[in-house]
Amino acid sequence: MARVKRGVIARARHKKILKQAKGYYGARSRVYRVAFQAVIKAGQYAYRDRRQRKRQFRQLWIARINAAARVNGLSYSKFINGLKKASIEIDRKILADIAVFDKVAFGALVEKAKAALA
């Protein structure tokens, strides 16, 4: 039986990892063993942060809506409650966009929410 030499496969595997680690600082981009750990850790961070990104954006939208609603004399929770009672179904992403870029339209939404609460 012929002897199996793994040089080609090992080289390819190492090249693949070192290519992924390109741009990392110091040994993390040059030494296979260190680069492998760095790439694994980067993958874990990426996986975790793809989920956190969704939470962080929602927090940002809520903070923006809250600030704009308070300028118009209503808290965030009362504003959202008023919109629900007025059966206005606009998601937080769009509300935050309106709050930042179209203050007049947001003011109108606040007035409708106030009317529904009264």
Curated annotation (Swiss-Prot):
One Pfam family cited in the UniProt record for this chain: Ribosomal_L20
SUPFAM superfamilies in the cross-refs: Ribosomal protein L20
Regions crossing the membrane: none
Disulfide bond keyword on record: no
Keywords recorded for this protein, A-Z: Ribonucleoprotein, Ribosomal protein, RNA-binding, rRNA-binding
Gene Ontology BP terms: ribosomal large subunit assembly; translation
A GO term, aspect molecular function: rRNA binding
GO cellular component terms attached to this protein's record: ribonucleoprotein complex; ribosome
Function: Binds directly to 23S ribosomal RNA and is necessary for the in vitro assembly process of the 50S ribosomal subunit. It is not involved in the protein synthesizing functions of that subunit.
Family per similarity comment: Belongs to the bacterial ribosomal protein bL20 family.
Protein's name in the database: Large ribosomal subunit protein bL20
Naturally occurring in which organism (per UniProt): Serratia proteamaculans (strain 568)
UniProt lineage: Bacteria, Pseudomonadati, Pseudomonadota, Gammaproteobacteria, Enterobacterales
Record gene name: rplT
